[in-house]
Amino acid sequence: MKKLELNTEEIMKILPHRYPFLLVDRIIELLPGERAVGIKNLSVNEPFFPGHFPGHPVMPGVLMIEAMAQVGACAILCDEKYQGRLGYLAGVDRIRFKRMAVPGDSLLITTEFTAIKGNIGKGKGQIKINEEMVCGGEFLFALG
């Protein structure tokens, strides 16, 4: 199966998210319905950095979870069976944070599905920076 890639414009045709809440810049690997790998480049101009935390900017953990969910949504919603639908984050388990993500970092975000039954999908995700684990965990998705 050919691995696909998506630029920001193509991602915005799949996901309803827009600035400041679109948290994936590119998909560099895509196996529809199975897995996706995305990139998020963190700029000092991200809207969350001034308040989290002043003088010590750190990407909020909940936004890292959302970034993994958005990459997963790209994977599932590119499958012909699910095109045109919405993906909702329905649950998280065993999320662990190993290091901080700060301005200038490039996040490598991988999400893959382990099971899909009906309108519910189960998967796992992780974020790495320069091969170093930032965070990871398990997800539950609902399709609307």
UniProtKB/Swiss-Prot annotation:
UniProt catalytic activity: a (3R)-hydroxyacyl-[ACP] = a (2E)-enoyl-[ACP] + H2O
Record-linked SUPFAM superfamilies: Thioesterase/thiol ester dehydrase-isomerase (SSF54637)
Enzyme Commission number(s) from the entry: 4.2.1.59
Domain of life where this protein originates: Bacteria
One GO BP annotation of this record: fatty acid biosynthetic process
Active site (UniProt): H52
Keywords for this protein: Cytoplasm, Lipid A biosynthesis, Lipid biosynthesis, Lipid metabolism, Lyase
Enzyme class: lyase
GO CC terms in record: cytoplasm; membrane
Main location (coarse class): cytoplasm
Claim: Metal-binding is one of the keywords in the record: no
Pfam families registered for this protein in UniProt: FabA (PF07977)
Disulfide bonds listed in the record: none
InterPro entries for this protein: FabA_FabZ (IPR013114), FabZ (IPR010084), HotDog_dom_sf (IPR029069)
A GO term, aspect molecular function: (3R)-hydroxyacyl-[acyl-carrier-protein] dehydratase activity
CDD domains for this protein: FabZ
Subcellular location: Cytoplasm
Family annotation (HAMAP family): FabZ
Similarity field: Belongs to the thioester dehydratase family. FabZ subfamily.
Chain's role: Involved in unsaturated fatty acids biosynthesis. Catalyzes the dehydration of short chain beta-hydroxyacyl-ACPs and long chain saturated and unsaturated beta-hydroxyacyl-ACPs.
UniProt cross-references to PANTHER family, sorted A to Z: 3-HYDROXYACYL-[ACYL-CARRIER-PROTEIN] DEHYDRATASE (PTHR30272:SF1)
Official protein name in the record: 3-hydroxyacyl-[acyl-carrier-protein] dehydratase FabZ
Native species: Syntrophomonas wolfei subsp. wolfei (strain DSM 2245B / Goettingen)
